[in-house]
Amino acid sequence: MPETPPTSRTKRIELIVEYAAAFAAMILAGWVLKVVGAAIAARLAYPGDIEWMEGATLVSAMRARDGLALYGAPAGDYIPFIYPPLYAWIVGALAHVFPLGYTLGRSVSAACTMVAGGALVFGARREGASWPLALSTLGLFAACWDDGGTFYDLCRTDALSLALMGWAVVLTPLPSPRATIAGGLLLAVAFTAKQHVALLGLPMLVWVGRTHGRERAKLFVLSSVVPALCFLLVMTLATGGDFLKWLILVPAAHGQTLAR
């Protein structure tokens, strides 16, 4: 027996229930954002390391500001990090205008976290979520602050790489070839902030190929892999090979903790 199509009254009731639930979720998300936002605001100007990498990350930014090498042999006053230089470059450039310190570094990360949140809302809307429901995803994102290591506002490269990676993920699936190019370029730029995002490239490439075809997949490779390889080549030549040592060889020598 065929199902009876829903009446207009039933549709209205379902729509009301859907929007009521979405607004309730948005209100709860607003409360979470208020709590986490207050904690982040209270930490911005804290005059010391909140996490062990912060001070050393600011030293990298100071060296970038002063035009000193970021990668080389370890010394008594400086040991390079195992990450690409984009965050240090950005904070170092801003340090020509603003005082270099914890507030500047954390503000950059907090701003990047907001940009990442924008990608989350954009992606939810693209998948058909209503505005209240899409905005409520920000509450879920904020709720991960503590369990994620509270890196949203730390002087680290994580928030920057997350923002770039997030927009790469939500732009690449769009129908327009320009969106594919933009997503690929953003993924390449994210690689200059944290090399781990390269792991996203393969599943994204497979998805683009299966959804949009081989030619679009080639376009994604040209806009993501090629710029990333050019970056690696330039940095390797500029540092006499030291960049690759810190980016690949040093992390490869570390023990792996799978629980993390």
Where are the model-predicted features located?
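Multi-pass, polyprenyl lipid-linked donor-dependent membrane glycosyltransferases
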Residues: S107-C112, S136-A143, D147-W167, A193-L200
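Loop-to-helix entry region of an early transmembrane alpha helix in multi-pass inner-membrane enzymes
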Residues: P85, W89, V97-G118
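Transmembrane-helix motifs of polytopic, lipid-linked glycan transferases
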Residues: I27, S107-G128, W167
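Perimembrane helix-loop-helix junctions
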Residues: R12, L199-A228, H254
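Transmembrane-embedded, aromatic-rich helix segments that form part
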Residues: I181-L187, F191, Q195-R210
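Extracytosolic helix-loop segments that constitute the early lumenal/periplasmic catalytic or substrate-binding loops
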Residues: A41, E54-I79, L86, L244
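Specific aromatic-rich, kink-prone transmembrane helix
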Residues: L160-A179, G183-L187
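Transmembrane-helix signature of polytopic, membrane-embedded enzymes
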Residues: G118-C144, L162-A163, R178-I181
